């Protein structure tokens, strides 16, 4: 599915330009950019692409920064601050996003940060703006984006931060899945798309041998590493895109609360990717435990990948599934 905002920005990704790329941008787009910072890990990232939580490299300045509006407000404000930091005086920020995605609010903040020199064009529900850095910057409030902060969850201390979906609360689906997997896990466990590590911590309370927590989000890896530090002797935290770099058939159990949005869009292909990777990674006699919104048709989507699909529970708009009997899927 083509993203109109990305298409508007592509002609500007050339020359002395820094691309700030979240999940909206493809690997190919990141590779084409001469300079890129992304908070989403992909396999085979070249040296020209920095994977981090939108942290500026030292002593670098650019004449242009290109940015597609992100979904989370704190990420937007962090990227605006980063763009202002990385631009030379009179350099330009080129930004695009949808009218229903918050682009108008973002442009108001950008004017406050960069100065009033802005050119905006309208494109069928989307806006493209070119903003010149005309003044010394005073950073806008990005909710202390770079800082981990403590969450108390039923007496347990966790750490999280902006840049993660639901970073300041426990997802209800994850709570339901934790109850479902109680006393069900052993051996090797994979938390696929671990977020800030809530499911991983629940798994570590059981009699398991090892746990791998993987995510493609830089903020998730920072938080999970902190949350799982007491169990470092049997935990591996992996920067990975949906298990692509992990060896097949190595996990007794996989636990997963998969995303069903990529940026602003609901992506069935993303759900299928998680299902297919789960089938590749789990052992022949292993189980995959999923929790999803009830409107996601897991039984139909998983039919191609698993012989057994057991609907365990429906509660508060979420479905818990136990998938087993993984099939060998053609590439």
State where each predicted segment sits.
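C-terminal catalytic and target-recognition region of SAM-dependent MTase-like enzymes
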Residues: 288-331
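N-terminal auxiliary segments of SAM/dcSAM-dependent transferases
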Residues: 75-151
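A short, conserved alpha-helix within the catalytic core of class I
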Residues: 73-81, 264-274
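Short beta->alpha hinge that forms the Motif I/post-I loop of the SAM-binding pocket
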Residues: 98, 215-220, 266, 270, ...
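Conserved SAM/SAH cofactor-binding pocket of Class I
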Residues: 1-46, 172-247, 253-256
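SAM-dependent Rossmann-like transferase core, predominantly class I methyltransferases
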Residues: 124-186
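Conserved proline-anchored active-site loop of SAM-dependent methyltransferases
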Residues: 64-74, 192-197, 251-264, 278
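Short glycine-centered segments of the SAM/dcSAM-binding site in methyltransferase folds
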Residues: 91-92, 285-287
């Amino acid at each position: 599915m083509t993203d109109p905002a990305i298409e508007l920005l592509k002609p500007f990704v050339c020359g002395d330009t820094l691309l700030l790329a979240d999940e909206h941008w493809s690997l190919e787009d990141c590779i084409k950019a001469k300079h890129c910072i992304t908070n989403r890990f992909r396999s085979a990232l070249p040296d020209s692409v920095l994977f981090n939580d939108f942290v500026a490299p030292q002593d670098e300045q650019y004449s242009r920064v290109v940015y597609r509006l992100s979904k989370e407000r704190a990420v937007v404000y962090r990227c605006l601050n980063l763009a202002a930091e990385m631009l030379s005086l009179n350099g330009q920020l080129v930004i695009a996003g949808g009218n229903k995605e918050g682009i108008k609010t973002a442009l108001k903040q950008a004017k406050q940060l960069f100065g009033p020199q802005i050119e905006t064009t309208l494109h069928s529900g989307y806006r493209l703006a070119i903003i010149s850095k005309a003044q010394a910057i005073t950073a806008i409030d990005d909710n202390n984006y770079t800082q981990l902060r403590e969450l108390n969850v039923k007496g347990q201390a966790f750490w999280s931060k902006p840049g993660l979906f639901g970073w300041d609360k426990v997802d209800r689906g994850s709570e339901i899945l934790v109850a479902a997997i109680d006393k069900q896990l052993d051996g090797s466990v994979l938390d696929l798309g671990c977020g800030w590590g809530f499911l991983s911590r629940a798994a570590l309370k059981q009699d398991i041998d090892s746990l791998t927590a993987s995510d493609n989000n830089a903020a998730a890896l920072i938080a999970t590493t902190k949350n799982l530090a007491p169990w470092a002797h049997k935990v591996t935290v992996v920067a990975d895109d949906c298990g692509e770099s992990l060896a097949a058939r190595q996990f007794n159990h996989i636990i997963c609360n998969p995303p069903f949005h990529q940026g602003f869009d609901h992506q069935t292909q993303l759900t299928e990717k998680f299902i297919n990777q789960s089938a590749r990674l789990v052992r022949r006699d292993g189980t995959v435990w999923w929790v999803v919104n009830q409107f996601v048709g897991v039984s139909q989507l998983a039919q191609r990948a698993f012989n057994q699909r057991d609907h365990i529970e429906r509660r508060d708009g979420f479905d818990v599934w136990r998938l087993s009997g993984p099939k060998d899927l053609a590439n």
